[in-house]
Amino acid sequence: VVGNVPGLTVEAAQQAALGAGAKVVGSTSFKLAEKALQEIERARPDMVLLTGGTDGGDSATILHNARMLASSRLAMPIVVAGNRAVAGEMCEILGRGGKEIRRAANVMPRTGTLAVEAAREEIRKLFMERITQAKGLDALTGLVPVVLPTPMAVLEGVRLPIGGGQAARQ
């Protein structure tokens, strides 16, 4: 998780990631330094969630972070879920760096307003496309109606006794 401020966009990004079933192996805030980028590379995450700035707010930090990620050796998808005003520019920067990009709505469009669902859904899609295949879970697709990350499965399990969860309706 890469974000601007530890208690704001980084926290929102962690909520999105954890709610989608991702394992957060690290987080960094403010402008990415070379040392922090090396730590991300060493952690070898399945994906990076790039967040920061409210919509129309600070753009310098997230653009700097996009440039740092673009120039890195990281070879995993990057989910961009930050300042909407510069989302296109971030994707362009990352694309020029040869990165696979997934775009989602800002996890914190306004200070104090969490909007993690779009990022959570992109992370879940990546989980389904990549992680399940890499871990051999794709073999279950014909045997069960849907494969869910553990946190989502637990939430669905809680919903079932009170009227049926989303997975039960599929």
Give the residues covered by each predicted segment:
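Nucleotide/phosphate-binding catalytic cleft detector across ATP-hydrolyzing
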Residues: 1-168
